[in-house]
Amino acid sequence: MYDLIIVGAGPGGTAAGVYAARKRLKTILLTAEFGGQSVVSEDIQNWIGFPSISGTALAESFKKHLETAKGDSLEVREGVYVNKITQNGDHFSVETSGGTFETRTVLITTGSHRRKLEVPGAKEFDNKGISYCASCDGPLFAGKDVAVIGGGNAGFETAAQLLAYCKSVTLLHKNPTYKADEITVQKVLANEHMHALPNVDLVSIQGDKFVSGLTYHDKATGKEKQLAVEAIFAEIGNIPTTEMVKGLVNLNDFGYITVDPKTQRASLPGIWAAGDCTDGLYHQNNIAAGDAVKALEDLYLYLKAK
C-alpha cells in the first residue's frame, strides 16, 4: 500500500515527486513519458531559472531530478498508462497497463492532449501529411510548403520551428486576432517565408496518398479558397486527460477536474489534481509545478492527520 500515487510526469508530477521524496511518503509516480506538452517545444523561454531550454531538455531535466530524489520512499515507473482509478473502501485502486496499485491518496497531474481536426480528409490523411507534433514530423517536410492550424502560442511556436527548414509556412486562425503572446506573433510574422490567414475556417483537406492541399473559408469575403501544401500541423487546443477519474470526481463541462484552488483537492477526499487537467484559470508549466507542490503539502497534512 502506497501513501501516494502520482499520475503524470510533467512539471506538476515531477515537482510533487521531489516533494514527496523529501517528506518520505511512500510514493510511486506512474507516467507514460516525461515532460508534458512542452516536450514538443524547441525553445521555452519562461521556465524559471532557464532563459532558454528545449522541451526535450526540460523533460530530461525532470527525469534526472526525480532520479536524484529517488530513494527507498519514491519509486518511478515510465511507460505506464493509467486506465482507471476507483475507490476501494478507505483507499484507492489504480489500474494501469502494468498492473493494479493500491494507495491511500492520489495526485492527478496528467495534463491534456491535442484536439484533433474534424473536417473532411482529417482522418484519411492522419499521419499522411497531417501531424500533431512538429518536433516529430517537421523535418520530413524540409523544403516544402506547409500549413499550421491555430493562432495560439502553440501554433506560432510550431510555425517558428517549421520556418527553420520548410520552404514556406502559412498559419490559419479562426479569429481575426491571435491568442499568442504579441512578442511571439511579431517575431514569427517578420519572417519573409511566413504567411498568416486570420479569420478563416478550415473546410477540408485534399490529397491522394498524402496531403496535397486544403480548402478554407474566408469569413471577410465569404469565399472559399484553396491552398497547396504538403503538410498540415494542427495546434487547435487541448482536451484534459481525465478519463481515468470520470465518475470518481467532479469534472466541469469541458472535462477538467474541479478543484479547490487553495488546496488543489478534488471533490472526493483523498484525490488531488494539479496543472492542465484541472479547471484552474491559467495553464502554464510554472503554475502546474506550484499547484502540485500546494497539493503535496495539503495531502501530507491529510495523511498525517489520519
Residue map of PLM features:
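Phosphate-coordination loops involved in phosphoryl transfer and adenosine-cofactor binding
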Residues: 1-3, 79, 127, 142-144, ...
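Rossmann-like nucleotide/phosphate-binding core characteristic of flavoprotein oxidoreductases
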Residues: 1-7, 19-25, 215-219, 225-231, ...
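Beta1-alpha1 glycine-rich phosphate/pyrophosphate-binding loop at the start
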Residues: 2-74, 144, 156-182, 252
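Redox-cofactor binding/interface segments in oxidoreductases and associated redox assembly factors
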Residues: 7, 108-109, 148, 234
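Residue-level detector of alpha-helix initiation sites
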Residues: 10-11, 112-114, 153-154, 279
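A Rossmann-like FAD-binding core segment of flavoenzymes
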Residues: 66-96, 100-103, 164-261, 301-305
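Glycine/small-residue-rich loop that forms an oxyanion/phosphate-binding "nest" at active or ligand-binding sites
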Residues: 76-142, 151
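FAD-site-proximal beta/loop scaffold in flavoenzymes
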Residues: 113, 118, 124-140, 236-283, ...
